[in-house]
């Protein structure tokens, strides 16, 4: 089943426009963007409204909690953990055999997430996302 195609560019998500309409996509890109950059509810803060109806499953990640954190190695560890947790459902649901996340800080105010997904057939797909950090 296809969804509206999403893109991540310069730290922001958006719909992909064709010449006359919105494009559709059935790749992992949408699932990864939504999982990483939807704010997971933390202690009653933020979160996706649909989680109220998801019987214990919550969509998104805690990456938003790091947006004002100092750019320190231990914060990169947190970013890597939060991204891995947000993508774990891909493994649990059999969409992927494994998911590996590497978080880095290539320049000031930038969080870079490199995602490697091993699919059930053994093939791999890689995605890289840049997000604003500690503005």
Swiss-Prot record:
Pfam families membership: GP46
Top-level taxon of origin: Bacteria
InterPro entries per UniProt: Phage_Mu_Gp46 (IPR010877)
Family to which this protein belongs: To phage Mu protein gp46.
Name of protein: Mu-like prophage FluMu protein gp46
């Amino acid at each position: 089943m296809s969804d509206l195609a999403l893109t991540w560019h310069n730290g922001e998500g958006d719909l992909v426009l064709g010449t006359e309409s919105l494009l559709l996509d059935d790749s992992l890109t949408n699932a990864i963007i939504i999982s990483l950059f939807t704010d997971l509810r933390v202690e009653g803060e933020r979160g996706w409204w649909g989680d109220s109806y998801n019987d214990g499953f919550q969509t998104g990640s805690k990456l938003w909690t790091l947006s004002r954190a100092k750019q320190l190695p231990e914060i990169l560890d947190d970013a890597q953990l939060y991204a891995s947790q947000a993508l774990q459902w891909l493994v649990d649901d059999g969409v992927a055999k494994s998911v590996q996340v590497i978080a880095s800080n290539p320049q000031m105010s930038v969080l870079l997430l490199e995602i490697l997904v091993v699919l059930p057939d053994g093939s791999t797909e890689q995605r890289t996302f840049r997000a604003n950090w500690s503005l």
